[in-house]
Amino acid sequence: MTITALLVLTGGAYAHNYVANDLSHRSADAALRITDLTLSQVVYDPLPADGQLWLTFEAKAGDPIYMQLGVPYLERLADYRPSLALVGPPGTGNDTVPFALPAGTSARRFDTLERDPVFFDEPFTGTQSWILVEEEFNLPADGTYYIVAFDPAGNGGKLWTAWGKREAFKFRDILNLHNVIRDVRTFHEVQDKRKPFLTWSISTLSSVLDILFFWVR
């Protein structure tokens, strides 16, 4: 059974493409660029105290956006309630945020304090999370946008931000899946726990293919 077959058999689950994070995306000027807003992708971040995670993309009026905010399923994060903001051209929103906005932009804010977290079991990595924000709508204007994750209380904590619904994997993504699974499980602090069978199968097949491809190159 190939990794592709495993992904097809579990097609009802989310299979976000992993986006590497060098932890430098703390301002609009240093925002992580999203090149395809429709592709299902996720970035993990150990948000520092009083810090933000900034992502940016270009869009046209009417373009759809789907975005999520979540935190790892860890006891110490049970009451952690970070927020998400969409920053963009005038008309994006009229909310205030606890950080400086780029000139000529406005913000729409998604707070989570009054929202009920949704438990999420991610079968490919064998990790669990609480989803705090899940929003889908059409963008109001042409221009540059930012997705910003932040903590209104100014505390640090682990979180992830995801966007897009279209699931697509390239061959190099499959070769790297075993490394992604390792990194994601470490972020969720379950790296020392036994992997579920599906996670183990995907990780093992990816590792074997990676080794074989290395030797035939």
Where are these regions (language model features)?
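Bacterial N-terminal signal peptides
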Residues: 1-8
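Short loop/turn segments at connectors of secondary-structure elements within structured domains
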Residues: 9, 61, 76-80, 141, ...
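Sec/Tat signal peptide C-region and signal peptidase I cleavage site
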Residues: 11-15
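Hydrophobic beta-strand segments within beta-rich accessory/binding domains
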Residues: 54-76, 144-152
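C-terminal edge strands of extracellular/lumenal beta-sandwich accessory domains
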Residues: 16-28, 55, 82-93, 124-217
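Extended, solvent-exposed segments with strong compositional bias
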Residues: 43, 103-138
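Extended low-complexity, serine/threonine- and proline-enriched intrinsically disordered segments
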Residues: 80-109
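N-terminal edge beta-strand
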Residues: 34-52
